[in-house]
From Swiss-Prot:
May be involved in transcriptional regulation. PROSITE patterns: ZINC_FINGER_C2H2_1, ZINC_FINGER_C2H2_2. One of its GO terms (biological process) is regulation of transcription by RNA polymerase II. Belongs to the krueppel C2H2-type zinc-finger protein family. SMART domains: ZnF_C2H2 (SM00355). It comes from Xenopus laevis (African clawed frog). Gene3D superfamilies: Classic Zinc Finger. It is found in: Nucleus. One of its GO terms (cellular component) is nucleus. InterPro entries: Znf_C2H2_sf, Znf_C2H2_type. Residues 1-21 are annotated as: Disordered. This is Oocyte zinc finger protein XlCOF29.
Amino acid sequence: MGMSEKASDTGMKGKKKDKNERNEKILNLTLEMIYLLTGEGYVIPKKKKSGDDMAPPQSCTDCILEGGCRCHVTNLTGGRALHAPGSVIQKENNKNDKKILELVSNIIQLLTGEEWEYIKRKKALYMEGIKEDPQQLSQWCEYEDKSIVMCNLEATACLNNDPRNDTVFCEHRDLSKFDTSLAEQSLPAIGIKGEPVSCEGANQSDCNINPLAEQIQGTDTPTPIMGCSLNNSLSDNYISNGIKTEATSCEAGNQSDYGNNPVAEVQLTDTTTPVKRCSLNSILSDNYIKIAIKEEPPSWEDENQTHCSINAPGEQNEEIDTPTSIMRFCLNSSLLDSSLLNAIKDDTLSCEGENYSDCSFNPLTEQTSPGCKQFTCSECGKTYTRLYNLKIHLKSHTDDKTFSCSECEECFTDHTDLVIHRRLHLTLKAFPCAECGKCFTNCTNLRAHSKTHTGEKPYSCTECGKTFRDRSHLNIHKKRHTGEKPYTCSECGKCFAYRSNLMVHVRIHTGEKPFSCSKCGKCFTDHANLIVHERMH
């Protein structure tokens, strides 16, 4: 234990010494750069030696407190004396610039050299990390020889990654023919949660993962499914398409083509063996976020895999037919919106002699379900989807107004209308007049009313000088001077300057007399005539 501790202490001291030397070099280079930039130097004072230490002058308080000042700092240029502060130095720009660049490069080497020396010693471990993260490869190649870092062309190409245990299944392939565009393309935003796939006794000839050509942000990484290819045709504004696929077992079957092929068409490697694949083609509408599709695990045992696909309408995908009969079945999954898909048609497979029956399903092709009840009014034939709405409508035929206002006694057929009416009474009391107590619905009307108490008439006619409290009254008055009469009676053709006068005139033709005297019962067409009549009583 004693020897090991002593060795560790020696190693720590050595590291500390190296670090101090490096810091001293950086400091020396920095001060030399300052000298080249400013042209100011420092005088080296002669210090008295007491043993091995050099003491600063006792007259300088800065040296006593801090251990050194500007005038007594030891020069870092080999001990030669420099010019005193404030002296004029001839500047040689070209030489100084070159020296400054050299000093900067030396400082950078001192700061970064330690990391790259450590990486060189741990080269084997770092190479494994580069294989997992290809982005580090380009950074490494900027500093080191590419022949050292580049992967061996005889290395193995990964065919499948198991997300659960991070196990990598690889086979020997020539990486010189490997698709290098995969590193340049971004992974698609298609989240596929895949279970482990086992392939026993199967011929694996090709496995390609071809992501989308355009960059779509996503978090999940697609996992290749052995024996199945997932073709997702996405529209413009998709974020993610979550598909949870259960385990697929392939035993004693020929698997020649399997991969993940999104919208970007990338040619797969041609093979001589017959292609038998299970492709999932989803064409989605615009602006939808997620579609959750859970697919049960099909199994292939001692049989050839039949051609199966899930094709949404809108795009024809060329598939390879097989002699095995194709059964159509329905993927009945709850979708997010009625306008999401008009139809989903699925070409599925027969596994182990079991055939699925034919049943097609078009989710929510109509806005209203055909089995929805329709409530029809017996009076007018109007239909409603809710019985409550029909009952309210029937009251309009019977004039049944059971809901009445407690303040004005106005009646309504629906309680909702009564609630809305009561709010009017509340708003009428919102702006009361301080002089007479009259209430108004808004502040503008209250301000106009207050002018009646103050007698203010700010609007005057330029023709006759008559004043008015409101601008609208002034505009009506101006029509007398211009002689404008825009309102014409349709019966006799008589014209009027005011709409109110036209309405009174029309009552002469219709015989309507809505204003009646409460004492004698006499009726009048105009309210002004009624007021004149009431003065007689």
